[in-house]
């Protein structure tokens, strides 16, 4: 009876998150430096909206909002999968250097192609980011076999991130003057300039990864209880690990390719959702993390583009200020539990 009530409460919370996301999405459509209100939004639906408002809503705001929702959710799920894989509550795509490595590879491809006068495709950027993510994950996995302390492993991941960021800054210096501003803005993290093409591509990739992760909820749940238990339940540990690495890396790579590195969403959101839902079950956590990541990223993006309008902040700066305290609190609580 208690279990049924808890499950019902969790489903209710997920429903509330969906409603909250829809409300925030509507608010975001009406939020910006251009004075567009409910009247213009209504006119858009009945076809009587003027060209200026139409372009602002459909070309700028809607793609940006959808990108924030899709990519914020992707980062949160990526963080959850990495935390399951490493059994470490402070693992995440940004902390382990996955995002920074993906950023480096995309920067290399962008600078090389721009210098040679070639046009790079969306899939090319994703492929470059994915290779960068896999490289970082490979290094972390090698270190995991040699380093027993998970805290030390995370420190190594942070160092990998710093090295990749430093090399990226070095690479950007060799870009053409006309492209430096775009490269710099992208490297800081931003949804500015997102198009519906980017949204469609990212949605397809993210949806595929989410669907795969959700279908593997039971094996992932068994893996959370220990490798021995998972093996007894018939889980192919090696195959599951490969899937976790590929899915988390591809989710992180997709975000980095289109929006640049976005910090702390992947590490903080899974913990926030665990605290709210009082569970770590993947069947509940995967959709909850996606919704939580989407909501938080959407709020942070609204702050980034309106707080000092017309000047726009990088999304990563806002997420760092808002979510870094959550990570610090987590580390402090973890230290207190160990000392007891």
Set out the residue ranges of the language-model regions:
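Alpha-helical transmembrane segments in inner-membrane proteins
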Residues: 1-340
